[in-house]
């Protein structure tokens, strides 16, 4: 096969080059990217790649650590990114594959901002029959016996090889594509700087760190296709947050990608005020190049990959094979039934061992004098549940995204019933003067459970998976013109804890009973002036618990004995880490019930962390009558 011949050539080349003198080696370091012929920089994403061949240079693999775990071969290593301004750049990462594996699909995993390349990704992937590399574009690595934190990254920059904590990691050479922190103190992701540590002497997309990190990822694809255990025709890419955007940029610049899954990124970088950024390293130019199957993981309240940009992104891609998975209420995190969709996507398109159901189709009907009516057309194979979520807190004013609102908006839930071979439900709205955003989730049962490493490498076990419809957005003008009715009135009862109440609450740790909601931010449950917050709780044993409002918390002692205990709270009962309180309930957006929570001081503060509540004893508590009480 041609890739095996290339690999053999690289090995021979490396052996020969090892005998060359240092001067001759230096002469071989021809820059990876051609110099600009004029002072004009590339003006498009495609033009930025002119003259770059990701397979042209040796890969120069350096194995820094190797071990076996659960019949999986794992290696911390570095490969050559390229030569820039005469200096070699090297990408560190963690590579893993099942021992004795052959003709395996290969995965490139890209971490997010502030995160690490982590061995748990290739380890869990290998157990499912994949070879994969978790690349460390920012320099941080997490592996047994080889951890590179920001401290070790700084030691590497400073060349302090005598320090016992020193470790080799990603080396950007003459350039700087590091992040959190960057080596030169200036983040070159949102900007296009010109400096002695950038490639071009004029504003150029090749100076931007998105471009450089994407180049490093493309070289990662070359690394994968040269490994003897990998089928080079079956390569996939996935990543979270900044890694989600980099996944889109990589798939949008390299045809070797046969499937891609961005989570919480790759759809909302479309509002930068710099025209050169928009034309090159923003999301749309890459999205318009994507022809491979793509699955977007986009939680409803994510600040980085916003759900209202998802439909636009779908319209931009060239691929007809796409799905979306949108968890309600979540921001930049997910639970197992949403995270597992990435594994199923690769199983279908790289292994041919799974078939993903079709995308749920949603339609919102507006009729005079009636509530908005939702109808669905779904793939009914192995359906576990069907849910519709909607909000009237979506932003459609054309202004800059209100990040606080995006992360906090409340999504109402309604169950869906089948009548006359059609799935349908009505929506109770509180105003025709506010926009209406609606989407549906269909959850399917898995034949057997799947275990994997999540967005932040926490291990999850999924018994089911969820696919979403595209969100439908309806303007206030459309609601008024249709003369639909707004039937939802202000309500003092926040939660009755009956039926499907948990659908309007959420948790990122389902192994514990703690739960949270944004209901108090919705106008329907706005607190009257001078109201108290009241609920009743039943605990099996004496315990402590917390009630949290954003970063403000109060502690409650419970008597236990399986008897109902009333709790009445004033807004002044909730304190932040500085022991300060707010004057009004309207200042808060999220309500939490949990057993224990630690308040952390701001960075640089001398205030000690404060723990409230205590680890729970006995069965999970029961709740009822969560409401606002108006003093008589």
Write out the residue ranges for each language-model feature.
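Short beta-strand element of the alpha/beta-hydrolase
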Residues: 92-95, 102-112, 132
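Primarily recognizes the serine-hydrolase "nucleophile elbow" in alpha/beta-hydrolase
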Residues: 115, 219-278
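Extracellular ligand-binding interfaces
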Residues: 493, 506-587, 592-610, 616-631
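The feature captures the conserved acid-bearing segment of alpha/beta-hydrolase catalytic domains
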Residues: 265, 269-317
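Cap/lid segment of the alpha/beta-hydrolase catalytic domain
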Residues: 123-126, 131-214, 271-274
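Catalytic histidine neighborhood in serine/cysteine hydrolases
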Residues: 317-334
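N-terminal cap/lid segment of alpha/beta-hydrolase-fold proteins
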Residues: 51-101
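Surface beta-strand/loop "capping" patches
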Residues: 347-390, 415-418, 483-487, 529
